Amino acid sequence: FYTYAFGKLTNGFLSDRANIAKFMSTGLGVSAVMNLFFGVTSVFWIFGILWAINGWFQSMGSAPAVVSVTQWFSSKERGTYYGIWAASHNIGEGLTFIGTASIVALFGWQAGFIVPGVICFIVAIILLFSLQDRPETYGLPNVSEYKGEVSTKKKAKKSIKDFQLDVLKSPIVIKIGLSATFLYTVRYAIHS
């Protein structure tokens, strides 16, 4: 849980600079491998180490998804597509509970890790070859320019790093972060 939380913080910054397809597929691929290992070990301390590694790499999923939505859709479209993404995340989680419970009931607890691990590894490979990085990577214009949403304001002189530091210092971001911490604590307590 803690490596996942810390990973969401740091991987959010890294995904701003990384190739989205490589970043997201690496996170999912390593998480898939960790799930395969979960299915073949029953040693508690090994399981704990694998769980921490898994948490870190799972945290590489949401940030690049948000970056991708931001890079490929205009400000007028983002709310719709972000809403679809958020809904699919929750629907997928619910279906995962049902699917994994069925797999465990039919084939045992190890299969509850191995089968999803194999599926996620296949999806990671598909993502690597199908998820597109930023439009500029392919010689396309920025989506804001393409959609005619270019701001008339002067370009900011701050670097991405400076903007990120400003965000971290923002009282509202700190409040939202604390709220999310408590929300996730309750969410995981309910799941358990």
Task: Spell out what each predicted region is.
Residues W45-W51, K175-I176:
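Short hydrophobic/alpha-helical segments at membrane-entry points of transmembrane helices
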Residues S170-S192:
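Extracytoplasmic gate region of multi-pass secondary transporters
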Residues L50-I91:
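Cytoplasmic helix-loop-helix junction between adjacent transmembrane helices
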Residues K22-L36:
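Structural signature of the two symmetry-related core transmembrane helices
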Residues W85-P135:
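Helix-loop-helix hairpin linking two adjacent transmembrane segments in secondary transporters
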Residues F1-L9, E93-G94:
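Residue-level signature of mid-helix packing/kink "hotspots" within the transmembrane helices
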Residues N19, V40-W45:
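Helix-breaking motifs and short loop linkers at transmembrane-helix boundaries and internal kinks
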Residues Y138-K175:
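Juxtamembrane intracellular "pre-TM" segments in multi-pass secondary transporters
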